[in-house]
């Protein structure tokens, strides 16, 4: 059986929006580009036609990928817990004990992860270390370079 793809509601909506855009805007544009390139004549040495075919293949592959991800998506429900434990979907504020730097992240599935936006994968070393933990707990993160400790300050 294929692996589930863990997504928040926002993540599913983003994928659906991208899919709709590809189906309703990009795909028709690519088809028009193909028609225009085909009308230029000899297809054997037609760079525009080759480029349009390549673009069509890329778009169709992305459409298929999005459809597969959406069909295999496992929705993360409301992240609030009665016991305060961190789970996928939780927003967590922590302090790195070695640098005293404070960070705030949201734990999401791997497909949605974007560290620059503070969205970390549930498969990341930090998420693996803090999942199931609570405010006030300190944990060691087993990083590739060197392990470090963090203290959980806030969970939303």
Curated annotation (Swiss-Prot):
Recorded superkingdom:
Bacteria
The protein here is known as Transcription elongation factor GreA
From its record, what is one biological process in GO terms?
A: DNA-templated transcription elongation
Function recorded in the entry: Necessary for efficient RNA polymerase transcription elongation past template-encoded arresting sites. The arresting sites in DNA have the property of trapping a certain fraction of elongating RNA polymerases that pass through, resulting in locked ternary complexes. Cleavage of the nascent transcript by cleavage factors such as GreA or GreB allows the resumption of elongation from the new 3'terminus. GreA releases sequences of 2 to 3 nucleotides.
UniProt cross-references to PROSITE patterns, sorted A to Z: GREAB_1, GREAB_2
Gene3D superfamilies reported for this sequence: Transcription elongation factor, GreA/GreB, C-terminal domain (3.10.50.30), Transcription elongation factor, GreA/GreB, N-terminal domain (1.10.287.180)
Matching InterPro entries: GreA/GreB_C_sf, TF_GreA/GreB_CS, Tscrpt_elong_fac_GreA, Tscrpt_elong_fac_GreA/B, Tscrpt_elong_fac_GreA/B_C, Tscrpt_elong_fac_GreA/B_fam, Tscrpt_elong_fac_GreA/B_N, Tscrpt_elong_fac_GreA/B_N_sf
The protein's matches in HAMAP family, at most eight in alphabetical order, are given as: GreA_GreB (MF_00105)
Q: What is the lineage of its organism?
A: Bacteria, Bacillati, Mycoplasmatota, Mollicutes, Entomoplasmatales
Species whose genome carries this gene: Mesoplasma florum (strain ATCC 33453 / NBRC 100688 / NCTC 11704 / L1) (Acholeplasma florum)
Where, if anywhere, are coiled coils annotated? 2-78
Which is one Pfam family of this protein?
A: GreA_GreB_N
User: Which family does this protein fall into?
Assistant: Belongs to the GreA/GreB family.
Q: Could you tell me the gene encoding this protein? A: greA
Q: Which UniProt keywords apply?
A: Coiled coil, DNA-binding, Transcription, Transcription regulation
GO MF, one annotated term:
DNA binding
């Amino acid at each position: 059986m294929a692996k589930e793809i863990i997504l928040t509601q926002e993540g599913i909506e983003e994928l659906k929006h991208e899919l709709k855009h590809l189906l309703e805007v990009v795909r028709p544009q690519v088809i028009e580009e193909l028609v225009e390139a085909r009308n230029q004549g000899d297809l054997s040495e037609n760079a525009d036609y080759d480029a349009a075919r390549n673009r069509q293949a890329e778009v169709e592959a992305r459409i298929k990928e999005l459809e597969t991800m959406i069909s295999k998506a496992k929705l993360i429900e409301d992240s609030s817990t009665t016991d305060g434990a961190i789970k996928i979907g939780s927003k967590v504020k922590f302090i790195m004990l070695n640098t005293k730097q404070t960070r705030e992240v949201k734990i999401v599935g791997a497909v949605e992860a974007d560290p620059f936006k503070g969205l970390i994968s549930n498969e990341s070393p930090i998420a693996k270390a803090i999942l199931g933990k609570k405010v006030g707990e300190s944990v060691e993160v087993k990083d590739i370079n060197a392990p470090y400790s963090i203290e959980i300050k806030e969970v939303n």
